[in-house]
């Protein structure tokens, strides 16, 4: 899963998101207070967001991410519980579970069940290559938000990610769009174009879901150096 630089939560005023508001006024106020706290009390900093790359296992073969070439490693449920015990994490900290592909983690169900019970303010990121497993996980473990990767149409998807996953992403979006807030994650890279970005924007409009646009960049953890 590629790291994202948020360009705009919505492309323009005609792009409608789902019935569930992505952000409320209280979210902005809370983050403002958090920023002031971290600025004025550096010894008592709190996190607004924590992304946990809990596994290197992934069934995609992406050109813009080489994590699938790394040795298989996982953070255990016990590891995650230790992280969550940190004093910089509060009940308002949004925790993102990703990888690799998080649902391939050998303890994925136990981890999601723990978060559902002890820190329900968590999100799930997925490539949706196992659509039924993603659908079942969302319905059973109730993540606050689902982020799914879509970098272009069928042809671009296959070129960029090395597999036929486009229709599986659409299946998950069609099935869950009225059950959980969904964001399409588009990464602009040397392997796709602005035409692909326009395509993904139109998909977001069709299903009335959010879209996030990021720009490809190098990152040691993903072995992205080109």
Regions found by a protein language model. Name each.
Residues 1-2, 6-12, 75, 144-145, ...:
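Radical SAM enzyme [4Fe-4S]-AdoMet core and its adjacent flexible, acidic
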Residues 7-12, 18-144:
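Conserved alpha-helical substructure of the radical SAM core
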């Amino acid at each position: 899963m590629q790291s994202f630089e948020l360009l705009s939560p919505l492309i323009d005023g005609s792009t409608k998101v789902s019935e569930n508001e992505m952000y409320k006024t209280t979210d902005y106020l809370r983050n403002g207070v958090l920023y002031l706290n971290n600025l004025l009390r550096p010894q008592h900093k709190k996190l607004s967001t924590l992304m946990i790359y809990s596994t290197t296992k992934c069934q995609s073969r992406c050109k813009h991410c080489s994590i699938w070439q790394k040795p298989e490693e996982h953070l255990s449920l016990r590891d995650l519980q230790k992280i969550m015990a940190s004093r910089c994490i509060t009940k308002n900290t949004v925790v993102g579970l990703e990888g690799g592909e998080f649902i391939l983690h050998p303890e994925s169900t136990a981890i999601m069940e723990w978060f559902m019970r002890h820190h329900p303010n968590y999100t799930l990121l997925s490539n949706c290559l196992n659509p039924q497993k993603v659908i079942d996980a969302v319905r059973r473990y109730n993540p606050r938000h689902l982020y799914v990767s879509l970098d272009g149409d069928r042809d671009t998807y296959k070129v960029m990610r090395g597999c036929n996953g486009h229709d599986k992403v659409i299946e998950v979006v069609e099935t869950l769009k009225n059950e959980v807030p969904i964001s399409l994650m588009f990464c602009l890279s040397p392997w796709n174009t602005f035409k692909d970005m326009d395509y993904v924007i139109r998909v977001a409009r069709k299903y009335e879901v959010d879209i996030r646009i990021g720009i490809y960049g190098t990152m040691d953890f993903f072995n992205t150096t080109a």
